[in-house]
Every structure is written in structure tokens, then in C-alpha cells.
Amino acid sequence: MTIRVLAICCYLLCIVLFSGCAAGKVSVWREYKVYCGMSSKHGEVSEDAWQRFCDKHVSAAFPDGYTVLDATGYWRSGTDAAAKERAKVILIVAPADAREKVLSVARQYRKDFDQSVVLVSCSEAETVVVSAKDADGK
């Protein structure tokens, strides 16, 4: 009975140790999403204005990179009417201590483009960096 229990424990330990293995370095970071509405009281935010904002604020805060997605946001307005708006979503994968930099970008967007709100979400993200070396199996 003891050998059987020991064998099962070893088997389970191997599963735990090797189940997370993948090519490249694995680390746990955060995935931040900043939802930026493209409408304001003054009209639509132009692509040029958006690009200037990203160049000045987002790229400066996250020089290692970020991703921008085009989106359409839907919500209920204060009058309970359905509303939709063109939007941009900035995806940033960074260490947990980047939270204040992300919030600073969101605050700056809200200020620069007269937004009532800018939504920021954060979730844990397991990241795996796959390099050319890993892809070649070396």
C-alpha cells in the first residue's frame, strides 16, 4: 500500500511540475485594457489626433509595446436609451506595478478628449515569450 501511495504521489508531482512547461520563459503579468471612446462633445476624435495621443502618451509610458484594437462600444445612456460609439482599445501586457502608468494614460485621454469616463480593466495574464531560438528547437 505504501509503494502504491508513493507512486501515485510521484505521478501527481510530475503532472504538476510539467503541465506548465512551454517553449520560452513563462511569467505572470497583467493584461490591461484601456477603452477609449472616439466621440466627444466636440465631435469625433480624428485618427491623426489619436495617433498623436498614442505617440506622446502611450508609447512614452510603454516603449516596449502595446496593441490598439478598433471596436464599437454599446451601453445604456443616462436616459436609458441604447447607445453605441466607435472606440479604440489599448492592450498592454506589463508587470503588475505598471498599474499607475496605465491609469495615467487613461486619465490623460479623458482629459485631452473630454470623455466622461474611460474604462480600464486588468486581469492576470500568463505570458510565454517564443523567440526564433525557441521556434528552431535550439
Language-model region placement:
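C-terminal motif of bacterial Sec signal peptides marking the signal peptidase cleavage site
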Residues: 17-20
